[in-house]
Amino acid sequence: MKEVNLLSSAAVLRALYDNKKDIYDVIAEFIRASIKQKSIRVFDSMECTELLLSEFGFRIPEAIVKSCLKNRLKKNGEIDLIDGRYCVSSKFSLNEQAEKDFSTSRNNYEKIITELTAYCESRIIVPIDRSRLKSDFEAYLLNPEKAKEYTSIIANFILVNEETPEFRSKINQIEEGLILYTGIRYSPNLSTLGHWSSELTIFIDTEHLFN
């Protein structure tokens, strides 16, 4: 069974959001991918919610999953609702760009982990627990203040590489994807996700204004 990693999934989330801008369309792509990966033909919303967790590490409220199934996949004719269960139709398909984003994200993540492992091995005498290192890396990006076994060396690794544009871009995509994911889990209104709807007042010092 393939390893599930929230960070690579978060990076895909950010990439798809850039392309689509509608968060329900983005979640729908993850639903399509999970259905395709497990080759399931019949399911309900709860099973689909569990698929998103097992395949991508996403804990998404079932109500949101239901909305995506009804207003995206069913509306497009990709699935049919029969006796309370969804059945995959012949129109079901995963967007080619989405597939490319999934593949690119996983490759980018594995490259970062490989570089991180090599960095740790060059500075730590004892053998590296790769599984723990991955877990601590995820924990660090989710909450840098929470100390783990490899927190210090992970912070050093990021500091050493942060001036490299490609590396910084990959880390930014993961971090921004995690922010979107948090919004999906806890926002009462997904339609406002990524938008600033309230009045914003900006104060600029005259020294900067006329420079």
Label each region the model flagged.
Residues 2-211:
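Noncatalytic, typically N-terminal accessory segments of nucleic acid-processing enzymes
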